Each structure stands twice: as structure tokens, then as C-alpha cells.
A protein has these predicted regions:
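Thiol-based oxidoreductase modules, predominantly thioredoxin-like and allied folds used
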Residues: 47-49, 66, 70-84
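Short extracytoplasmic/periplasmic juxtamembrane "stem" segments immediately C-terminal to an N-terminal membrane anchor
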Residues: 17-34, 80
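Local sequence-structure signature of Cys/Sec-based thiol-disulfide redox active-site neighborhoods
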Residues: 28-68
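Extracytoplasmic/secreted cell-surface and envelope-processing proteins
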Residues: 54-56, 83-86, 106-108
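Structural micro-motif
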Residues: 87-100
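Non-catalytic, surface beta->alpha helical segment in thiol-disulfide oxidoreductase systems
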Residues: 98-139
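Short amphipathic alpha-helix with an adjacent loop that forms part of the alpha/beta core around
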Residues: 35-37, 85-89
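N-terminal targeting signals for export/organelle localization
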Residues: 1-23
Length: 139
């Protein structure tokens, strides 16, 4: 029974899904201070600090993606992010989190060399998001 539960959990993490409709309707950063109102939503979140060490500001890469696919991101300053349940997994800003019905599916790790290119290359970032999320709500 435990193996079945683990299999189902892993399948859900790997299966592609749609964001909630409201995140496909525009291409903006939606600033929030807490996640209570969207606790069960499916969305993409950008958490950031006061300093970005990347040569190209990663927010520019993310905004370009949002403009191209007409997708909005939740945006939360890292000081507020520390009070969320996701802080146990995402310890360093900046990061992008993919959330499915309130559960963390994937995130970019600013400390992981394998993720650095996704912060700096719009195609790499798009390919990463596309592994988890349908980019068009009509797909």
C-alpha cells in the first residue's frame, strides 16, 4: 500500500498540469504577502531578495517568458516567503516555484549549478516550465 501511495505521489509530480485559469489571463507579477487566499491554487511563483548576482537580471528572463506566453506569476519578497510552508525546501532567493493545488512540484535552486542557466536563458527557462505546466490553457 505504501508503494502505491509513493507511486501515485511521484506520478502526480511528473504529470503535466494546467495553472488555474486566472494565471493565463495576463502577463503580470501578482504581488502577495501571504499565500492564504491562493492556498489550493496551481500557479508559478517568483520569490526574490534585494540583490541579484546574475549578469542578466533573472526577473527580465521571467518577464520575457510571461509576455510570450501570457502567463502571470505570483511574486513574493523572500522576507515574506520565509513564513510559507515552501521555505523548508527553497532556502535561497531568487527562485521560481511550480505549485500544483498548493503542493510544491519543482523549483529553481539558486545554489545549484544545474539550474543557473535557467535563470539566464529564456529558452532554458521555458523548457523547464514546459516539463511541468501547459503553457497554453487551450492545449
Amino acid at each position: 500500500m505504501l508503494l502505491v501511495a509513493i507511486f501515485i505521489h511521484e506520478y502526480e509530480k511528473k504529470s503535466k498540469f494546467y495553472l488555474d485559469d486566472k494565471y493565463y489571463s495576463s502577463n503580470e507579477f501578482i504581488s502577495v504577502e501571504d499565500l492564504n487566499e491562493i492556498e489550493h491554487d496551481s500557479y508559478i511563483m517568483y520569490t526574490y531578495g534585494d540583490f541579484c548576482a546574475f549578469s542578466t537580471p533573472c526577473e527580465d528572463i521571467f518577464k520575457s517568458f510571461m509576455d510570450q506566453y501570457n502567463i502571470s506569476f505570483i511574486k513574493m519578497h523572500y522576507d515574506n516567503f520565509k513564513n510559507t510552508k515552501y521555505y523548508k525546501s527553497v532556502l535561497y532567493p531568487p527562485s521560481v516555484l511550480i505549485i500544483k493545488k498548493g503542493k510544491l512540484i519543482a523549483f529553481l535552486n539558486a545554489e545549484d549549478d544545474n539550474d543557473i542557466n535557467k535563470y539566464q536563458d529564456s529558452l532554458e527557462f521555458k523548457n523547464w516550465v514546459d516539463k511541468y505546466v501547459y503553457l497554453d490553457k487551450n492545449s
